[in-house]
């Protein structure tokens, strides 16, 4: 009789579990409050799925104990470009000395992965290995990695997250010159030799699209190059916005592929994996009934994703880019094409927003032309009916507001699986910012970030289940509040609150507590978002939902 009762109980629990799994519904339309996904948890993704947080060296470490990098040079030369508050990464979370605090926060979250970057100029202050290696930098990263492994947190290390040693920029304009390939290889070789016994997931370059476009086309990011008339305030120190982005992108791909080849040959015995990180977006037709808008959306996909993914899968640039860009687009030699094609074990995909695409004439040649115009596409966050995609993502009175669309992550993952051969994928960034003008209580009561994370995780689970996309991990951006590129300290992205007046004062925000429960698998029967929202808006901000 006891056996029958036991079997019945097991059956009921299994049935309840299946029912709960089936009841998870992703909200398809604005406002994406995630009220129907309160039972979503890590258990819906499989036991080996990695849930972590992410950061980058320049944004959290501070300037102590390293050489000067291009973001130091850029932010001091053009402080207004580094952030409207005129601040920079000289002093931020000071993770170089407070790394244990970061690890403690990750332990509190029960994170199983941490994506962070090495500061090239901390390890090799003058850029080239031949000019000396900083033992203090090596020791710092060893201590951090050892502390992570002690807590069973898997390190994902990015070799280059935009902070190129300034010496290499001064000598030959960094990625604009092929000399960078050997210097990047030497730097990577040192890192593999020094840390490869502990680190099994390597990322070569973060967001291949960003430095060529923002750094060399429009000059809004380091190193800040562009054509004279692209920045009418003449704050670019030189450049050609029509040609340099394609050269930089080409050299990035060759540097990436060279490092992957090094890892696969010289360090194969370490049994790790290596790949690049892509910034992704989804592009919807501005007018779904207009063939020109539909064509513009796909053309944007080719210029945004295909620019890198076609070489990485086929060894050549997309046909549409070759047709439009012409001689401004470099060519791969046969040997280079073979080197680049297939040069990844996994892809890291960063996803934040979706945009509407409509045709726009390409003004080339002109004094104000940039490579970003070659697609002949205008991007907006509202469609032909004046409808916005979703809730506010970033308020920007100068450049215009942006809005987010959780289902976009579903479309992006399916697109990469279908078009690029079903790669192994890690979502290496996904996150939401709030304004730093909020007071402490408001910043900690970040229910909007819970909505953002929860709704995106819901669609990520959905695309894995429905389309069989091979996603093995998700990293929320960011571990804690930090310096944001081009925004300074005017926004907060963290799951943990950082008090800039007392850097040891850090607390999990409500989003951090939610993510903690999500990872633990204890969000079933959690309080509804509406109740959470009203509670967090009240004066009882300090109330903990430990039973949620």
From Swiss-Prot:
Annotated substrate binding sites: 59, 161, 206, 352, 477, 484-485
Which Gene Ontology terms of cellular component type are present?
A: vacuole
Q: In the Enzyme Commission scheme, what number(s) does this protein have? A: 3.2.1.147
Keyword Zinc assigned: yes
Q: Name one Pfam family in it.
A: Glyco_hydro_1
Location within or outside the cell: Vacuole
**Disulfide bonds, which pairs?**
26-458, 34-454, 226-236
Signal sequence region: 1-20
Which terms does the UniProt entry file under GO BP?
carbohydrate metabolic process
Q: Where is the active site?
A: 429
Kindly list the GO molecular function terms attached to this UniProt entry: metal ion binding; thioglucosidase activity
What UniProt keywords are attached to this protein's entry? Disulfide bond, Glycoprotein, Glycosidase, Hydrolase, Metal-binding, Signal, Vacuole, Zinc
Q: In which tissues is it expressed?
A: In vacuoles called myrosin grains of a certain class of cells, myrosin cells, distributed in the cotyledons and the axis of the embryo as well as in different organs of the growing plant.
Can you tell me which residues are glycosylated?
A: 110, 240, 331, 520
InterPro entries to which the protein is assigned, alphabetical: Glyco_hydro_1, Glyco_hydro_1_AS, Glyco_hydro_1_N_CS, Glycoside_hydrolase_SF
For the protein in the UniProt heading, the enzyme class is: hydrolase
What does the protein in this record do? Answer: Degradation of glucosinolates (glucose residue linked by a thioglucoside bound to an amino acid derivative) to glucose, sulfate and any of the products: thiocyanates, isothiocyanates, nitriles, epithionitriles or oxazolidine-2-thiones.
What is the similarity comment for this entry?
Belongs to the glycosyl hydrolase 1 family.
Q: What else is known?
A: It seems that the absence of a catalytic proton donor in plant myrosinases is not impairing the hydrolysis of glucosinolates.
Q: What is this protein called?
A: Myrosinase
* Organism field: Brassica napus
Q: What is the lineage of its organism?
A: Eukaryota, Viridiplantae, Streptophyta, Embryophyta, Tracheophyta
């Amino acid at each position: 009789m006891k056996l029958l009762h036991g079997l019945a109980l097991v059956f009921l629990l299994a049935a309840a579990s299946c029912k709960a799994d089936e009841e998870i519904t992703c909200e398809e339309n604005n406002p994406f409050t995630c009220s129907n996904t309160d039972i979503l948890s890590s258990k819906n993704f499989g036991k080996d799925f990695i849930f972590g947080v992410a950061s980058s060296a320049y944004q959290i470490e501070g300037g102590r104990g390293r050489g000067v990098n291009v973001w130091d040079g850029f932010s001091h030369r053009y402080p207004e470009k580094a952030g409207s508050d005129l601040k920079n990464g000289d002093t931020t979370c000071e993770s170089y000395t407070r790394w244990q605090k970061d690890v403690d926060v990750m332990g509190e979250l029960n994170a199983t992965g941490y994506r962070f970057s090495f500061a090239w100029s901390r390890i090799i202050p003058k850029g080239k290995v031949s000019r000396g290696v900083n033992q203090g930098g090596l020791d710092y990263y060893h201590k951090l990695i050892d502390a992570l492994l002690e807590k069973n947190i898997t390190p994902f290390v990015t070799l280059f997250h935009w902070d190129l040693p300034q010496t290499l920029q001064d000598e030959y304009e960094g990625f604009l010159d092929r000399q960078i390939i050997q210097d990047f290889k030497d730097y990577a070789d040192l890192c593999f030799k020094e840390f490869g016994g502990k680190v099994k997931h390597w990322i070569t370059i973060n967001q291949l699209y960003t430095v060529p476009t923002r750094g060399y086309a429009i000059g809004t990011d380091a190193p800040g190059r562009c054509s004279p008339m692209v920045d009418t305030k003449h704050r670019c120190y030189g450049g050609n916005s029509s040609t340099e982005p394609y050269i930089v992108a080409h050299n990035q791909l060759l540097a990436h592929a060279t490092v992957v080849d090094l890892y696969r040959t010289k360090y194969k015995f370490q049994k790790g994996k290596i790949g690049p990180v892509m910034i992704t977006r989804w592009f919807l037709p501005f007018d779904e009934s207009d063939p020109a808008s539909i064509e513009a959306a796909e053309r944007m996909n080719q210029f945004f994703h295909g620019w890198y993914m076609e070489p990485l899968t086929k060894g050549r640039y997309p046909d549409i880019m070759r047709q439009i860009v012409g001689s401004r687009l470099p060519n791969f030699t046969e040997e280079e094409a073979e080197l680049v094609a297939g040069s990844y074990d996994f892809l890291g995909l960063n996803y934040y927003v979706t945009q509407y695409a409509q045709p726009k004439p390409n003004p080339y040649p002109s004094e104000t032309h940039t490579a970003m115009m070659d697609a002949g596409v205008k991007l907006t966050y509202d469609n032909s009916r004046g409808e916005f995609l979703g809730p506010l993502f970033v308020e920007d009175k100068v450049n215009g507001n942006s809005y987010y669309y959780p289902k976009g992550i579903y479309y992006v993952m399916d697109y990469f699986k279908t078009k690029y051969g079903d790669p192994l994928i890690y979502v290496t960034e996904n996150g939401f910012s709030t304004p730093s003008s909020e007071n402490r209580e408001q910043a900690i009561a970040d229910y909007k970030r819970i909505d953002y994370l929860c709704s995106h995780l819901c669609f990520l689970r959905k695309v894995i289940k429905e389309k069989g996309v091979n996603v093995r991990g998700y990293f929320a951006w960011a571990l804690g509040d930090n310096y944001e590129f081009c925004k300074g300290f005017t926004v907060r992205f963290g799951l943990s609150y950082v008090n800039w007046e007392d850097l040891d004062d850090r607390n999990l925000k409500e989003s951090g507590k939610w993510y903690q429960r999500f990872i633990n698998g204890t969000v079933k029967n959690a309080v509804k978002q509406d109740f959470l929202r009203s509670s967090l808006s009240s004066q009882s901000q300090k109330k903990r939902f430990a039973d949620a």
